[in-house]
A protein has these predicted regions:
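Bacterial N-terminal signal peptides that target proteins for export
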Residues: 1-8
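Hydrophobic h-region of N-terminal signal peptides that target proteins for export
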Residues: 12-21
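Non-catalytic C-terminal accessory/binding modules of secreted extracellular proteins
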Residues: 23-39, 91-125, 133-140, 219-259, ...
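Primarily auto-inhibitory N-terminal propeptides
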Residues: 23-105
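Active-site-proximal segments of metallohydrolase catalytic domains
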Residues: 61-70, 120-245
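A domain-level signal for the mature, folded cores of soluble proteins
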Residues: 157-173, 258-263, 276, 280-359
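Active-site recognition of the HExxH zinc-binding catalytic motif
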Residues: 267-282, 372
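C-terminal outer-membrane/trafficking sorting elements
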Residues: 481-535
């Protein structure tokens, strides 16, 4: 692309030479770009002489969490119950060692599992941090969950009694029966459940049950599907006083996929636990096929498929909107034409000094807006398929959030990524972040359109650049017509399984590095080239 090396050199020089002054300058109000400065050449070096601007005000977290009165800051004690069945016990038979193992996985600061696990020829490094590490990182140290581990509780029935699906392919009744039995057992042991309650609710009541989960073993519908829900429970104290409680619980399985010896990673637990914190699902909760071919967030969000990053051993970190929804960060609004830059999302924002990890583009509708954030392959984001500027659209509806049906309409998704390559397939996400090849802008007229719901922001984003750990971009109301994104031409690619059945059709500018739909042997064809790939 013309002038790219020249621009990057100028940008690097600008960033290095002004580093000592940048903090003070960021405190200055931003200046609008006069029409005379707007470029006719998108690579005009004059663009980079503009100083970073400060936006109008910080947007406060709104009503986006699905639960209220949940403690999300400070040190919070959470119950973690280990429960087995009369026909399925934990792989670790010694109760003391079992509790000791989960104590490390859930509470130990800096915990790392050095093991490499293998399934079907694919190797997965062990977890890169404890559950406590994960949530302290996502909250920038504001939320410190400490898990009080109890168990194992020996349930009276076999796993199928609690996991058997009903006519709607649901097992929620059986799961609630399991949680009720666990509560009865805890009460019989003398535990004061009311002591964990706040305003009549026991928050973050978590269960790890022995064995496998139906989420990765659909051939056995009697297994329990990991989930989160609420149970009404009556607790009687030592004086036999009746105390009604709401048990807000989550549950997840012990074992990894269909194995008998490999422990499950922390991804599924973090996903379900995040429900109890107030986050909904971002995948299509009605159609798995649509959730794959027309993904909302895919591997980019823990509340979509990101809980399975690295097989679930290294779940993806929260997006800016997820952090924002739980009150762990504010997102500055873009209010001026000018040059903006972002640190990566894993770094704590410091608005007073002008350090931001995300920006918000407002529309005329308060419930519809765009979020811009910088993602690097580091920490809990290390297994990302790409690095750069992530652009997501929010179209908030209280009913959709509370009903957990945000993205069931593929043509009207409520929270989703706007992929740079305009390809929403879950497994072709290497082209989702900006810049991607020549695509370094996203506008209200381009492809994909910079749009949230039916509303457009006042600004377009262009000249997106990556420089070391920073992302820089220009925001402007008056976009030159020749800065619009070109439509992706790319190459048509068809992927077949070993039986010759087409399993994926897509268009990409990088056919040699296409993401495949799961593990196995595939035949990939594009143009006159046919390749056999084992994944």
């Amino acid at each position: 692309m013309k002038g790219t090396k020249h621009i990057l050199a100028i940008l690097a020089c600008l960033l290095l030479c002004t580093a000592s002054q940048a903090v003070q300058r960021r405190k200055e109000p931003g200046a609008r770009i006069p029409e005379s400065v707007l470029p006719t050449d998108r690579d005009d070096p004059a663009l980079w002489t503009l100083q970073p601007v400060k936006s109008t005000r910080a947007a406060s977290p709104g009503q986006y969490a699905t639960t209220t009165d949940i403690p999300r800051t400070g040190t919070v004690e959470c119950l973690l119950i280990l429960a087995d069945f009369n026909d399925c016990s934990f792989r670790i038979k010694d109760d003391h060692k079992l509790v000791q193992y989960y104590e490390r996985v859930f509470n130990e600061h800096g915990y790392i599992d050095p093991n490499i696990y293998e399934r079907n020829g694919v190797k997965y490094p062990g977890v890169i941090g404890s559950v406590n590490d994960y949530f302290r990182a996502q909250s920038y140290g504001q939320y410190d969950p400490v898990f009080n581990i109890i168990g194992p509780i020996h349930l009276t029935q076999g796993y199928s009694s609690y996991g058997k699906n009903d006519s709607y392919q649901m097992d929620i009744r059986g799961v609630k029966a399991m949680v009720r039995e666990i509560c009865d057992s805890l009460s019989a042991r003398g535990m004061n459940l009311a002591g964990y309650a706040s305003k009549g609710a026991v928050h973050q009541f978590s269960v790890i049950y022995a064995g496998k989960g139906e989420n990765s073993n659909s051939s056995d519908p009697n297994l329990i599907w990991p989930q989160a829900s609420t149970l009404s429970y009556t607790y009687y104290d030592k004086d036999n006083n009746r105390i009604p409680l709401s048990i807000e619980f989550s549950c997840s399985c012990e074992l990894f996929w269909d194995t008998d010896t490999i422990p499950d990673g922390i991804g599924t637990f973090c996903h379900e636990f995040s429900h109890t914190l107030g986050l909904p699902d971002f995948y299509n909760t009605i159609s798995e096929q649509s959730s794959e071919s027309n993904a909302a967030m895919g591997f980019w969000s823990l509340m979509d498929y990101g809980s399975y990053e690295n097989g679930g051993f290294s779940p993806v970190g929260y997006t800016a909107f997820e952090k924002y929804s739980l009150g762990w960060m504010d997102i500055e609004e873009i209010g001026y034409d000018g040059l903006y830059y972002l640190n990566d999302i894993s770094r704590k924002p410091d608005p007073e000094s002008g350090i931001h990890s995300a920006y918000r583009l407002n529309t005329g509708n308060d419930n519809q807006f765009i979020i811009l954030e910088n993602h690097l392959k580091t920490g809990w984001y290390k297994y990302h398929a790409a690095e750069g500027l992530m652009v997501t659209a929010v179209n908030y509806s209280k009913d959709s959030w509370q009903g957990n049906i945000l993205n069931t309409n593929s043509s009207d998704k409520r929270y989703h990524i706007l992929p740079a390559d305009n390809n929403s397939n879950r497994y072709t996400n290497a082209g989702d972040l900006f810049p991607y090849y020549a695509t370094d802008s996203i506008t209200t007229l381009g492809t994909p359109k910079l749009k949230a719901g039916q509303s457009f922001p006042s600004y377009s984003i262009y000249n997106i650049r990556r420089q070391d750990s920073l992302v820089t971009f220009l925001a402007g109301k008056d976009l030159p017509s020749n800065v619009e994104n070109p439509k992706q031409q790319g190459t048509a690619v068809t992927v077949y399984d070993i039986s010759g059945k087409p399993v994926l059709k897509t268009t990409t500018t990088d056919p040699e590095h296409i993401s495949l739909p799961g593990h196995g042997i595939y035949i990939v064809r594009y143009g006159n080239i046919v390749r056999k790939i084992t994944q």
